[in-house]
């Protein structure tokens, strides 16, 4: 199905099932511990051996010798896999560094060997016996140190210029010129990376924890140099990903290599301390913002430049993209700079680009509003735009940022905010309020599904879509139930298997909208088959209560399947609407914080997000996504930071003891409001995505609230005690 014109009225608009707050249908399995994750398919792969990864102890250089003799002789050891005995390997298109290193070492904890043994404990013990010898090369590990050497944009991401920024900024009546930094961050998903591989002749089955089944399958086949049709990926349940499981990782490749070598199933799991350095992370940024406005507060010039680092062949953190679209202004400049760093691979993490970019932009907007003497909510409203500032002929499909901000201000009680910093106290606590706009583009990906109508009236949905804790099972079931007129309880959903039609996968906030659109397309085809089976015109037929009705005639779905199960497979492809219209999602984030006047401790007291993100397919699962994202934004604002050893080139705090993330007690009150934002230009579902929007802008809202509470403007995240203590107002 080609979606190339705005959606008219369609079966989803009935909203009998879609748009309602249903519980997650996979919830009972997860809460009872019976949902099986990648490491838990014991019956399907009996007699599994275990692999333990040996990671490089240097960040850059060469492996001069690798002595595995002692490990191979250790109790229970079956094999030691290295680059020298693994056979010729390719490299996946989406991997920056090789997943099995040697002799060249590209980053710290790059896998250089896998010890395979009868038990996990034996493999771990034997791994400690592997002796690696290196020649260390000088590496670059500090973005600040490398910044000056990078003054040109990457070849494939040139600077964007509109109008005359330099002239407009010079003549601006009010201006801000400041630099902001965000640190390296880790995904820290609850489930570690884990895989289990089984070979049957030349056919590989891999159970793994991966967000994008087709990407994983394609890159694994390419790396192993086997036909892609010989690889099957299974990943029905994933314990969080946040972008860290978008791509093929070392656990999957090494499990496959080991299983082939020892001719039996092999399990490989990355221990928590290995994950930050062995896999990927959100790269640090250094962002320079210059914004100018006229006397009335209207922005006349905006420039956003961002520096980030990555391994050779890597890509920059696209932290400027929201600045191209969020506010009006005739004169604009954005640019990305990429330094070569020898830290572990930088790659996607929840809301790549916009999340760190808004951490800077939305502080700068507050600073400019203060200089202009305008309330920060009103300043954002004043500078709203309904068109792409770089192309005024290109409108937004839907844009309700003003409504998000006004609704949020009213609900939050913004009028009671004291605009003068440091004036509101609650005992020993300084109290402040902050706001930020949220923005995330609406990305669209082709997505397919297969839908069966069984003779007993039940419906089965099959797609390689994944559920990373987001509610995919539920919204796909809701879609099929709505389309075919059956109760939600009569729909079974099977996900995460490469033998199913290729879906959009879980990432980029596109999963819900595009995967349900794929199911919509398959159901439309199935509706035609059902109508044909009973002799009805499909375009004039309605589906409800297990029946198909055409005028005064009706038939049961059971009658339609008298000849056997009906099956339809279809995919949704998106045309040029995304080029004709700018498609984005918006939010208004409001935060109240308390800052202890003696210790500098920051406590988030309450948070509110008002979101405009297309049709909300399931308010309950969507709210869960947003409050989780808000929590992640709080972590980014106040605590999350991968500490870099800039002598040896690795992340020091590489576990959950050293890398702090928020817990329930850190945020006592969160509220989410969804505006009616049905968008027929987005998809036949008229939805968008919300899981990343809930993060975008939160950290800046907290930073702005801290400023309102204390008068201290922190531009370097996270906002830790040391950045507040010596500047706090005197204790009264």
From Swiss-Prot:
Name the needed cofactors.
Answer: Mo-molybdopterin cytosine dinucleotide
Q: Could you say which residues form the signal peptide? A: none
Disulfide bond entries: none
Q: What is its main location?
A: periplasm
Show the catalytic activity. Answer: an aldehyde + A + H2O = a carboxylate + AH2 + H(+)
What keywords are annotated for this sequence in UniProt?
Answer: Metal-binding, Molybdenum, Oxidoreductase, Periplasm
This one is known as: Aldehyde oxidoreductase molybdenum-binding subunit PaoC
What does UniProt list as this organism's lineage?
A: Bacteria, Pseudomonadati, Pseudomonadota, Gammaproteobacteria, Enterobacterales
The gene name on file is paoC
């Amino acid at each position: 199905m080609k979606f190339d014109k705005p959606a008219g009225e369609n079966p989803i608009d009935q909203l009998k099932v879609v748009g309602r707050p249903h519980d997650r249908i996979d919830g009972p399995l997860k809460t009872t511990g019976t949902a099986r994750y990648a490491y838990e398919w014991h019956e399907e792969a009996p007699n599994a051996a275990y692999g333990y990864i040996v990671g490089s102890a240097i960040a850059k250089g060469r492996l001069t010798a690798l002595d595995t003799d002692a490990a191979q002789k250790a109790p229970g050891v079956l094999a030691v896999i290295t680059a020298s005995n693994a056979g010729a390997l390719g490299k996946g298109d989406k991997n920056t560094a090789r997943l099995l290193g040697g002799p060249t070492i590209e980053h710290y904890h790059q896998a250089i060997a896998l010890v395979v043994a009868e038990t996990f404990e034996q493999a771990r013990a034997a791994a400690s016996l592997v002796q690696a010898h290196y020649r260390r090369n000088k590496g670059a590990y500090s973005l600040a140190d490398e910044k000056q050497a990078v003054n040109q944009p990457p070849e494939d991401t040139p600077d964007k210029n509109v109008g005359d920024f330099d002239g407009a900024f010079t003549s601006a009546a009010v201006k801000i010129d400041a630099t902001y930094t965000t640190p390296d961050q880790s995904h820290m998903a609850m489930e570690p990376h884990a895989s289990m591989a089984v070979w049957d002749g030349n056919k590989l089955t891999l159970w793994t924890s991966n967000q994008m089944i087709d990407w994983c399958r394609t890159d694994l086949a390419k790396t192993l140099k086997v036909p892609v049709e010989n690889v099957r990926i299974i990943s029905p349940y994933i314990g969080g990903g946040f972008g860290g499981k978008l791509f093929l990782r070392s656990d999957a490749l090494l499990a496959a290599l080991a299983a082939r070598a020892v001719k039996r199933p092999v399990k490989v799991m990355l221990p928590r301390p290995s994950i930050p350095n062995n896999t990927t992370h959100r790269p640090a940024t250094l962002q320079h913002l210059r914004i100018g406005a006229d006397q009335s507060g209207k922005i006349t010039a905006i420039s956003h430049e961002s520096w980030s680092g990555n391994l050779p062949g890597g890509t920059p953190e696209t932290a400027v993209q929201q600045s191209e679209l969020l506010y009006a202004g005739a004169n604009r400049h954005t640019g990305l700079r990429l330094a070569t760093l020898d830290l572990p691979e930088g790659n996607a993490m929840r809301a790549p680009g916009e999340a760190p970019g808004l951490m800077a932009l939305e502080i700068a907007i507050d600073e400019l509003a203060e200089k202009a003497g305008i309330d920060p909510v009103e300043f954002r409203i004043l500078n709203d735009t309904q068109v792409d500032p770089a192309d005024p002929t290109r409108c937004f499909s839907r844009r309700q940022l003003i409504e998000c901000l006004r609704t949020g201000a009213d609900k939050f009680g913004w009028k009671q905010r004291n605009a003068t910093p440091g004036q509101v106290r609650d005992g020993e606590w300084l109290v402040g309020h902050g706001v930020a706009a949220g923005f995330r583009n609406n990305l669209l990906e082709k997505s397919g599904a297969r839908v069966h109508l069984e003779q007993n009236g039940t419906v089965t949905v099959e797609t390689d879509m994944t559920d990373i804790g987001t509610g995919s099972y539920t919204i796909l079931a809701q879609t099929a139930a709505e389309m075919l007129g059956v109760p939600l309880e009569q729909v079974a959903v099977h996900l995460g298997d490469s033998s199913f039609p290729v879906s959009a996968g879980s990432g980029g906030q596109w999963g819900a909208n595009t995967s349900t659109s794929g199911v919509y397309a398959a159901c439309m085809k199935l509706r035609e088959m059902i109508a044909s089976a009973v002799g009805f015109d499909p375009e004039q037929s309605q589906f409800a209560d297990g029946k198909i009705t055409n005028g005064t005639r009706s038939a049961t779905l059971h009658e339609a399947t008298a000849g056997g199960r009906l099956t339809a497979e279809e995919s949704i492809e998106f045309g040029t609407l995304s080029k004709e219209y700018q498609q984005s999602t918006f939010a208004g984030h409001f935060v109240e914080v308390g800052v202890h006047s003696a210790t500098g401790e920051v406590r988030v007291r309450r948070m509110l997000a008002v979101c405009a993100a297309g049709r909300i397919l399931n308010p309950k699962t969507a709210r869960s996504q947003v409050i989780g994202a808000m929590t992640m934004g709080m972590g980014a604002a106040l605590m999350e930071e991968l500490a870099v050893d800039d002598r040896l080139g690795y992340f020091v705090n590489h576990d959950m003891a050293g890398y702090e993330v928020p817990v329930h007690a850190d945020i006592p009150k969160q509220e989410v409001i969804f505006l009616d934002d049905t968008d027929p230009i987005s998809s036949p579902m008229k939805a968008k995505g919300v899981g990343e929007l809930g993060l975008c802008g939160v950290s800046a809202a907290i930073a702005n609230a801290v400023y309102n509470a204390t008068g201290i403007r922190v531009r370097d995240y996270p906002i830790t005690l040391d950045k507040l203590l010596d500047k706090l107002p005197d204790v009264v």
